[in-house]
Every structure is written in structure tokens, then in C-alpha cells.
From Swiss-Prot:
Gene: argJ
Function: Catalyzes two activities which are involved in the cyclic version of arginine biosynthesis: the synthesis of N-acetylglutamate from glutamate and acetyl-CoA as the acetyl donor, and of ornithine by transacetylation between N(2)-acetylornithine and glutamate.
Compartment(s): Cytoplasm
Catalytic function, reaction form: N(2)-acetyl-L-ornithine + L-glutamate = N-acetyl-L-glutamate + L-ornithine; L-glutamate + acetyl-CoA = N-acetyl-L-glutamate + CoA + H(+)
Site (Involved in the stabilization of negative charge on the oxyanion by the formation of the oxyanion hole): T115, G116
One protein family per Pfam: ArgJ
Name of this chain's protein: Arginine biosynthesis bifunctional protein ArgJ
Species this chain originates from: Pseudomonas putida (strain ATCC 47054 / DSM 6125 / CFBP 8728 / NCIMB 11950 / KT2440)
Length: 405
């Protein structure tokens, strides 16, 4: 079940960015599993990609090509084209070349993206056979259809949209994402596509994407696994009648940054809310760290602990598991006598032990909620970090045990 995730909000079209969806029948006949996105001429494109050493063939190709002129993005679901070696790279190149031929653009201007089962050959002919239909379907209004088209084990499509005014001109930022498992970015089995009609210099756009991803997609985790295929792309078409953003400063940049960050955060958190088998949406907030890295180390130790995640599923306030995770996070010279731990506003541990004011009934009441905050005060400094995660349920095991059947 998706925790607090409802129908898609209104996804405003972005002038200069079109999406087309078609069926290749990669995993199921009739399933719309190929999405083509067209960027207007002159668009700037930036991306962040998985750090998994076994990154998929489309990731290798997209990382090479994103530095040049990008006109099309080609996504398929049902097959990750990962762990496929040189033949997989050739297959990705072939699908891009076919799309380029049909669209009349250089092959190097097409970026491929794949998600699905790892280690199986990409069904090139099926994908090639769907490309013309996807091109024929191109429209600025197809965001919702594309959000559904990129889904794998997701139960709901994910998207967000913002608009703001600058000098009387409306600027739009719209994005979609997919992902429900194998989520522990830097990046994870997650794909994200965000577009704006602002005109943004490539260097500014790249930094904006990196910063936005770092504060959103790189702060979510479901199962601790980092996928071979993660990518998040930010496209600026330049169709809004405004000056180009050439510096990371000024009113237009700040408004754009706010909109991009909000869209990134909303679609990233939607991935957690739709986590495979998730029944809880959990915020892990770590304050008082000596540096940001030790805050992240503590946060991920808590967020990845199977014992904590199963306690969350059972609504069991087993606070000792949280203390154990904090203690093994590897923070040097950690003084446990300074640490306080909270479930929402309930102090469950103080100065390294059970809080004198804590009762089991208080903890149980918080743990019974669908949305929970675990707050850890380290008492070592001024740094803070926040991570979003889920519980671990029977359904998660079932989904992943049956994924290939």
C-alpha cells in the first residue's frame, strides 16, 4: 500500500518538452512500456547517475552523451539492460540509433534509460517496433501517461509540478519519477525526469540538479540497495520569455531553485511512500552532529536496520534497537551520555538510557501511526541531516521473492 500517496496532482505542461508513450510488450503484451521525450532545440540538459560500479549500459551511454546536445530521451521498462556487457551497450546504441533515424536527429543526441529485470538481453526489436507510435503520441500534455509508462513495481504514478511568476512571466517546473524498491541512492532503482521552460546555462543547470538530487533523491532509502540504473534528469527548454540564468544568484535563480527543489522533494518522497510493501513513512532526523557525514552515518544506520524496520512494521516501540543502530554507526568518540532519542515529540531515551518520563503506551501510540519521525540528538555540534525511509513488511519479501515469476 502507498502511505499517504494519492492520485497525481495537476502536472502543468512545460513548453518545449513533449512526451510520447507506446507499447512494446517487453514484460506484458499491451503494456505501455516505452516513453519518448523530446527536448526543444537549444535546451540545456543535466543529469545525475547511479554510483553502482555495475551501472547499466544505458547509464554508460547517457553519461557520455549528456555532455553534448540532447534532443530525445528514450525510456523502456521491463528490462534493465544491466549486467549485459558489450552486447547490452550495443543494444542501447541500436535503439537510440533507430529513434534518431525516425526523428531525423544525430544518434548522439538520444539518451537511453532502462529499468526492470537485471541480466536479461534487451529486446531491441520490440522497442524499435514501438518507437514510431511513441513519436506519433508526442504531446506536452502527456506527463501523467508518461508517469504510468515508466512504472515497474510501483503501485501508483508519481509526479509534481510548480509554477511561479517572474517579471509577469509564468515559469513552470514539472517532474515525474518511478521507483519502489532497490532504493538507496546515490542514486537508486529510480528514474526521475524534471523539466522547466526557464532558460538556464548548462553549468548552472548541472549544479542545480546535483544540489536538488542531493537534498532529495540522495536522502531516501527503502532497502539499502543501490540500483544499476538510477538516473535523474533536469531539462531547461528556454521557452519562457525571460533572460538566461547564467549565475547561481538573483531573484529568478532563487525562485527556480525553490521550485526545482520542491518538485525533487515531492517526487523523491513519493518513491518512499510507495515503497514495496510499505505501511509506514518514516523520517529519520539527526541533529547535533559534529559534521554532516556523521549525521548521515547515524541516519542510515537507523534507516537500514532490519530490526528497526520490522519493529516499525509491527508498531513495536523497541527503542533499544534504535540505540544499538546509533552505537554501531561508526561515529568516532561518540559520547552516549549526550544522546537523546525521540519518537515524534516523545522522548524515549535520554543521556544514553531510557527517559524517566517515557511510558510504553506513549511509544506504542506513536508507532501505530502511518507517519513517524525518529529524531536523534547527538549533542556534538550544529550539523543536521534528514533521511526518509519505510518499514519492512511481509509484502516486501513477497514482492521481491516473486519479482521474476
Amino acid at each position: 500500500m502507498a502511505v499517504g500517496l494519492g492520485p497525481l496532482p495537476t502536472l502543468h505542461p512545460v513548453p518545449g518538452f513533449e512526451l510520447g508513450i507506446a507499447s512494446a510488450g517487453i514484460k506484458r503484451p499491451g503494456r505501455k512500456d516505452v516513453v519518448v521525450m523530446r527536448c526543444a532545440e537549444g535546451s540545456s540538459v543535466a543529469g545525475v547517475f547511479t554510483l553502482n560500479a555495475f551501472c547499466a549500459a544505458p547509464v554508460i551511454l547517457s553519461k557520455q552523451r549528456v555532455q553534448g546536445t540532447v534532443r530525445y530521451l528514450l525510456t523502456n521498462t521491463g528490462n534493465a539492460n544491466a549486467g549485459t556487457g558489450a552486447p547490452g551497450l550495443a543494444a542501447a546504441e541500436r535503439t537510440c540509433a533507430k529513434l534518431a533515424e525516425l526523428a531525423g536527429v544525430p544518434a548522439e543526441s538520444v539518451l537511453p534509460f532502462s529499468t526492470g529485470v537485471i541480466g536479461e538481453p534487451l529486446p531491441v526489436e520490440k522497442i524499435e517496433g514501438a518507437l514510431q507510435a511513441a513519436l506519433d503520441n508526442l504531446s506536452e500534455n502527456n506527463w501523467a501517461e508518461a508517469a504510468t509508462g515508466i512504472m515497474t513495481t510501483d503501485t501508483l504514478p508519481k509526479g509534481a509540478s510548480r509554477q511561479f511568476q517572474h517579471d509577469g512571466v509564468t515559469v513552470t517546473v514539472t517532474g515525474i519519477s518511478k521507483g519502489a524498491g532497490m532504493i538507496r541512492p546515490n542514486m537508486a532503482t529510480m528514474l526521475g525526469y524534471i523539466a522547466t521552460d526557464a532558460k538556464v546555462a548548462p553549468k548552472v543547470l548541472k549544479d542545480l540538479m546535483l544540489d536538488g538530487a542531493n537534498k532529495s533523491f540522495n536522502r531516501i532509502t527503502i532497502d539499502g540497495d543501490t540500483s544499476t540504473n538510477d538516473c535523474c534528469m533536469l531539462i531547461a527548454t528556454g521557452k519562457a520569455d525571460l533572460p538566461e540564468v547564467t549565475e547561481a544568484s538573483g531573484a529568478l535563480f532563487e525562485a527556480l531553485k525553490k521550485a526545482v527543489f520542491e518538485v525533487c522533494m515531492e517526487v523523491a518522497q513519493a518513491i518512499v511512500r510507495d515503497g514495496e510493501g510499505a505501511t509506514k513513512f518514516v523520517t529519520v532526523q539527526v541533529n547535533g552532529g559534529g559534521n554532516h557525514q556523521e549525521c548521515l552515518d547515524v541516519g542510515y544506520a537507523v534507516a537500514h536496520s532490519p530490526l528497526i524496520k520490522t519493529a516499525l512494521f509491527a508498531s513495536d516501540p523497541n527503542w533499544g534497537r534504535i540505540l544499538a543502530a546509533v552505537g554501531r554507526a561508526g561515529v568516532p568518540e561518540l559520547d552516549v551520555s549526550l544522546i537523546d532519542v525521540y519518537l515524534d515529540s516523545v522522548c524515549i531515551a535520554s543521556k544514553g538510557g531510557r527517559s524517566p518520563s517515557y511510558t510504553e503506551a506513549q511509544g506504542s501510540a506513536v508507532m501505530a501511526q502511518e507517519e513517524i519521525t525518529i529524531r536523534i540528538e547527538l549533542g556534538r555540534g550544529q550539523c543536521s541531516e534528514t533521511i526518509w525511509t519505510t518499514d519492512l513488511s511481509h509484502e516486501y519479501v513477497k514482492i521481491n521473492a516473486e519479482y521474476r515469476t
